[in-house]
A protein has these predicted regions:
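Glycine-rich phosphate/adenosyl-contacting loop at the front of the ribokinase-like
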Residues: 1-78, 250-251
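Conserved phosphate-binding/catalytic region of the ribokinase-like
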Residues: 2-10, 203-310
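A glycine-rich helix N-cap at a beta->alpha junction
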Residues: 70-89, 97
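Short, glycine/acidic-enriched loop or turn micro-motifs at the edges of active sites
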Residues: 17, 21, 61, 166-168, ...
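Hydrophobic residues at beta-strand termini and immediately following loops
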Residues: 56, 82, 243-244
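Acidic, glycine-rich active-site loops and adjacent beta-strand->loop/helix elements
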Residues: 58-64, 87, 110-112, 166
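Alpha-helical segments flanking ligand/cofactor-binding loops in enzyme cores
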Residues: 44, 69-70, 181, 212, ...
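Ribokinase/PfkB-type carbohydrate-kinase core domain
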Residues: 2-11, 73, 79, 98-240, ...
């Protein structure tokens, strides 16, 4: 970390250009351009919660890369560690059929962000941030990125939050489970969704069993996210507690809801809030995010989250 650099939290991952359509991709003729990706969604949400957050990544030395940096900066994200790279900026297209079922097409193979490695961690504030948010998607996009995630978990002196965020298009259950096993002993919190992530990586779907398995891997605490069922929060040997979900006032698109949860949770931890308060804030932010289209279509502010919390 360079002298004089002060951040509350760091997010490591790949931002993406988003092309969204209001109909199936096979029929779409017009797309809306925006920016998303789990790392960007979480970073923008954390900034909206008042955290000083840095996004560590690489974007292409192209116009989309420049626009991504500008988009993040305009939303309060510290972009000094968004390096320009000769690889292309990753992108995806998303459309929906009449029933609302979404379909995605990704264009990220060999992207600038996939060229990240441990050296990107070493040039960043990871070692000094209060909270470092890491994800399984980042680890899945290349071997060097998986090395970067593992290195960041070991390098961080603050609290590591890890979201396995399993994607079968990017990796295998075995490879994703291996990253979880390596990162969990360094994680203050593992956030894992059930049954999606837990079934693939742990072979478990019962929330208490999932929490126990992650604690046994070495995680300090575990947040098992259950959609409308809320969150099961487990810390050490204490009795797990259920944190209820907040009903969404409007459901437009579920894209990025989990990222909103993770980014808000990490931001509240970085500002010194308790884990339970941070999880409640994350559930509130996720419910608000459902009202917007795309990963960054509706980003909850701290005032909005506090209004939901009451």
């Amino acid at each position: 970390m360079k002298q004089g650099v002060v951040v509350d939290m760091v997010v490591l991952g790949e931002p993406l250009v988003e092309f969204s359509a209001d109909r199936a991709l096979s029929e779409a003729g017009t797309f809306h351009l925006s920016f998303s990706g789990d790392a960007l969604n979480a970073s923008v949400t954390a900034a909206a919660q008042g955290a000083r957050v840095a996004l560590v990544t690489r974007v292409g030395a192209d116009e989309f890369g420049a626009r991504l940096i500008r988009f993040a900066a305009e939303r309060g994200v510290d972009t000094r560690w968004m390096a320009r790279d000769e690889g292309s900026t990753g992108a995806y297209a998303v459309g929906a059929d009449p029933s609302g079922e979404r379909a995605f097409a990704y264009f990220r193979h060999g992207s600038a962000a996939s060229r990240m490695g441990p050296e990107d961690v070493d040039r960043s504030p990871v070692a000094d941030a209060r909270v470092v948010l890491l994800g399984g998607i980042t680890a899945a996009i290349s071997d060097s990125c998986a090395q970067a995630v593992r290195h960041a978990a070991k390098t961080a002196s603050g609290r590591v939050v890890y979201d396995p965020n399993f994607r079968s298009r990017l990796t295998t259950p075995e490879a994703a489970a291996a990253v979880l096993r390596d990162v969990a002993p360094h994680a203050a919190l593992v956030k894992i969704s059930a049954p999606g992530d837990s079934g693939a990586l742990l072979g478990l779907t019962e929330p208490h069993e999932i929490a126990r398995a992650c604690l046994d891997l070495g995680a300090g605490s575990v947040a098992v996210t259950l959609g409308e069922g809320g969150v099961l929060l487990a810390e050490g040997d204490a009795t797990p507690v259920r944190v209820p979900a907040f009903p969404a006032a409007e459901v437009v698109d579920q894209t990025g809801a989990g990222d909103s949860f993770a980014g808000t949770l990490a931001a509240w931890l970085a500002r010194g809030e308790s884990l339970t308060a941070a999880v409640r804030a994350g559930t509130a932010a996720a419910s608000i995010s459902l009202g917007g289209r795309g990963g960054t279509g509706r980003v909850a502010t701290r005032d909005q989250v506090e209004a939901v919390l009451g």
